[in-house]
Amino acid sequence: MTDTDQQITPADATIVSTGTGTKGPEERELPESLSNDMSLCLRILRDVLGEYDPQLLATFDTVRNYAVKASAEHFAGATADPHPDEDGLAKAVATIDAMNLHDAQLLARAFATYFHLANLSEENYRVSVLHQRENQVEDDEAVDPVNELTTAYHQLLTEMGPAKAKALLEKLEFHPVFTAHPTEARRKAVEGKIRRIAELLEENKRLGGSDKKENVRRLYNEIDALFRTSPIALKKPTPVEEADTILDIFDNTLFTTIPKVYHRFNDWLLGDKAGLEQPQCPTFFHPGSWIGSDRDGNPNVTAKVSRQVARKFSDHVIGALEEATRTVGRNLTMESETTPASAELKSLWSHQKEMSERLTDKAALISTKELHRAVMLVMADRLRYTIERDADLMYHSCDDFIADLQVVQRSLAEAGAKRSAYGPLQDLIWQAQTFGFHMVEMEFRQHSVVHARALEDIREHGLHGERGELQPMTHEVLDTFRALGAIQKRNGIKAARRYIISFTKSAQNVRDVYELNRLAFSHPEDVPVIDVIPLFEQLEDLQNCVNVLEEIVKIPEVQARLKATGNKMEVMLGYSDSSKDAGPTTATLALHSAESRIVAWAAKHDIDLTLFHGRGGAVGRGGGPANRAVLAQPKGSVNCRFKLTEQGEVIFARYGNPVLAIRHLESVAAATLLQSAPSVEKTNTEMTEKYAQMTEVLDNASHERFLDLLNTPDFAPWFSIVTPLTEVGLLPIGSRPAKRGLGAKSLDDLRTIPWVFSWAQARINLAAWYGLGSACEKFGDLDTLREAYEEWPLFSTFIDNIEMSLAKTDERIAKMYLALGDDENLSKKVLDEMKLTTKWVLKIVNDEWPLQHRHVLGQAIRIRSPYVDALSVTQVLALRSLRKKVDKEELSKSQQAGFIYLILCTVSGVAAGLQNTG
């Protein structure tokens, strides 16, 4: 690879042989519909590349073929070919090595485009499978096998009886909190094109003749545009722009999907009476957001930004409610003779007249003798005035709006128009109850050290700078509480009342926040209501959390909030920093132990506890299937409420498609209910006790091995050399810096996302598995490990997630990255532990190669692997060339920028290929 005519030396491109392993059956064929979609996309992509540059197409095919042949070497046992092409990867390296910088950039974009097309094809296939399963459900089945929520509730009914099961159902809550963590490596412009291509592919199956030809022509247009669109945004998004992520998901999925989720479950609950009786499904979906309010380490999130984002969310959701109200109202065309208005509805109409005869006269003109319709149209107009903040005509709270909707609903039901009462009007009520006038609850977060420094500054200089000027950060901290108060005044207390303290070390951290909240206001009546949430995230803090909580509940402000909320309290646990701090095995076990101890402590104090799980998308940050994570929680830790962070690529994957969003919401809600089933609680408790000795050995041994790696001399600089850590920090995928703004000088200050992301890019995934192999070797009892895998949900989920991570590693590619660091000792530690962990995980799950018995997932990864390999080779060669030439001062600024752009293209492409970032 050259910037002009300089090539990487042959020594730079050396590939170390990894030997051969046992081979298994040939890769299975794809399902027909998926195969057809992927073949069509690949054919169009190849045509597009050929139209752009025939040589680019030739190189794309050459590298692709070499990589496909070579990938058999990685998947030992995944192919029956007795003579795999051992030189395939070396040939791919040589081909890429010979390219100039511009052509390498185009090749990287071509492979990245392929992954986007493969991903959307797989997503469309999953949707089609769900539709097929829906069509196969019989009307007389006791449960809907496609809707896991019905299956879970049926099990509760069986185990606990109707009364107890209903009591649990009424408590059901699912709180996803959308964050702006920079883990979505795909830019917004690309997302839009992907969505349009997915829609065209879905339409393609139903068309024929000229319509199909037109569809294919449009596919050509979109795929051509996708390839020609830079995968890298021109600049980092601002926090206000990041809010568009939530708006997109709200518009495309959530606003219309949530009522469908409720209706699907309610239809099963009521059976033949569905649509004729008051719904029994609770509004269990409660979305939150850190976007525009999480200022921990992000100086771009200011008090002004928080106000702007809150206004953006509020205006948008009220606008959506206005449109929905107008649509529902226009369809309530029942005249008074067939559907007489209730006295309550007539009273509401009179109240509306008193408020504005202009609005009621306009509505009456449109809706003569249709009072239900007229009332709804006035309500829609009032929503418009709510956005405009007209004090006389606006709704001052969403509760007032919901109350008016329920008046209309009761009137319709009393008049016998029950299907109208419990149809689209009920959808609108659910939407208002779910999203309010704020769309998502904004949760504020800041580092404990920032609060402490602000108070020190105030004590030294005076609140109003009587003894010297306050620091800008102190002003910003105080302004943050003022912004929170302003949001509450505008959109209600529900819009913003949670304040999270990162790196909570003591009860003093909580006292600091309440004190700053008071100091920010001159008048006590202006002080906003806040619930301060401690976040425990490092190993030492997890181990000490109960002692800290014991002191927190003694704080007067906390006691007041407990009394006001019926003893409700929230505690957040961080999966990311604990994993980077202690290793994945120790972090998993420490979190499980902390949860159990917090639950016992809460029970002692009669506290209604909610545990907030700070999970990432990648396994190294607590990622993995959310429903399995719920079912693996300790007894009493969920209590029919599950709250977690949703970020980056996870948001798009879980909520980007309406059908898949329904599936995800039902699955998590089902697990949240089922976790309180006596059988599940019994299993989790007994298995935790049964395998306590095993987990102690695994914990200690894995922690020792992990710390041995981190404490090796020069590990931190070596890590930055053998991964694209520096380049990942340059990706314009989020407003947040890769390092905390408190003086990042080591791994301790590095955020967990680039830690996980960088290891994934190097095809090592170290953050997900390092230390487990040594721990299993130390324990040595394979039979017990296998029993734990079969019997204990926590352990089986943990092992399955690690097996998936190992399936995405590649020793051949990893060696190329590790060679960048020129440290045989550290490289050997990583590779030896990778082999040892792979050996033990495969023994535990009784597989010959990763994901052997999880066919669909394993096959998807195997098919993608050669294409990811090509991008990884391009990336590692570019990294090596860039760093050597920068050291020798051989590159101009434009050439250096070209290399960085190439690396960023490969980073985006590999992230799309692996389908996870951080």
What are these regions (language model features)?
Residues 2-464, 473, 530, 623, ...:
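Often metal-dependent polyanion-binding catalytic scaffolds in large enzymes
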Residues 269-287, 479, 510-515, 547-558, ...:
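Conserved alpha/beta core surface patches that mediate binding of polyanionic ligands
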Residues 301-332, 520-700, 704:
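Catalytic or ion-translocation cores adjacent to nucleophile or general acid/base/metal-coordination motifs
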Residues 367, 373-377, 417, 422, ...:
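Active-site cores of enzymes that catalyze phosphoryl transfer or operate on phosphate-rich substrates
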